[in-house]
Amino acid sequence: MSFTPTLLAWYAEHGRHDLPWRLTTDPYRIWISEIILQQTRVSQGQQYYERFVERFPTVAALAKASEDEVLRLWQGLGYYSRARNLHAAAKQIMEGGGDFPTNYADVRALKGVGPYTAAAICAFAYGLPYAVVDGNVYRVLARYFGITTPIDGTAGKKEFAQLADSLLSRTAPADYNSAIMDFGALQCTPTSPDCTQCPLCESCQAYRQGLIYDLPIKAKHTAVGERHLLYLFIHDGERMLLERRPAGDIWQGLYQPLLVEYQQPTSEAVMLADIHKVLRQSKGMAIQTPALQFRHVLTHRILHLTCYAIHCPTLPHLGNMQPVPFAELDNYAMPRAILKAMEQLRIGR
């Protein structure tokens, strides 16, 4: 049995047929699921998907929402540009008459929709013959066919896209795409794949040549930057000061307490001196010590956070900071790192 029929037979028996976005052909819901599942595990993504489509069941409902409301529902997923792009694309659809696009070019033209997402929507919603190529697909194809072309270069992307298209079932594109993605997620996993139970192992080039852990190949190595952030959780026992993060940086549009950023590791003594400079007009302030310090890892950045809870009997006026009652903090979308710090510092309890 050749590659595609074997894959479809495996999927019929082992595939994740009960995932909610596989039980619908609604392009809106499939779009939402595909955006959420970028950089997100299925188990976590399913919870967010169900909450998202319950709150915004249609394109119109999403388009009418405020950005703050969308970001708040997205809180904890990271990569917040995905949520902003979803919101912008929903408005784009409504401006075009309110009907979700039905062909690849128009789907691809939506804000934040790349080739993979457009192919997935067209295949899963409309049964059009487009092959998806994600991390799972790269891994399965690279191993099975023994491809050593780096997957992150122009040549590799073209080679894998052409190969995926040649293998696609024209009569069942949705099933084929689901099959190869599930096969990569469940069988041909990045680590510890169970090759002895694999229906493709006899003709798998990586298995035959002992290259399972060498494929696929990536050529580029993105440098990881480090940032040193001092966060001041200034409160009066009932309210805390927050500001919205600026555009063009991590966590754009989310809320945070007062931030002081350093270019290099800095001693607590220097940070405490800076706190007193910033809050020199605040009488009776009490700084909770020791500071909470932890590391937060993003895709291409490592953040070193130092966090102080500071009680001020009278909240100071500091730039664009606004006082937010503890009871309303849940209405403000904040980065996961800030929520973690608030919990450990027991802010708002």
Task: Set out the residue ranges of the language-model regions.
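Intrinsically disordered, low-complexity, charged terminal extensions of DNA damage-control enzymes
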Residues: 1-17, 23, 185-349
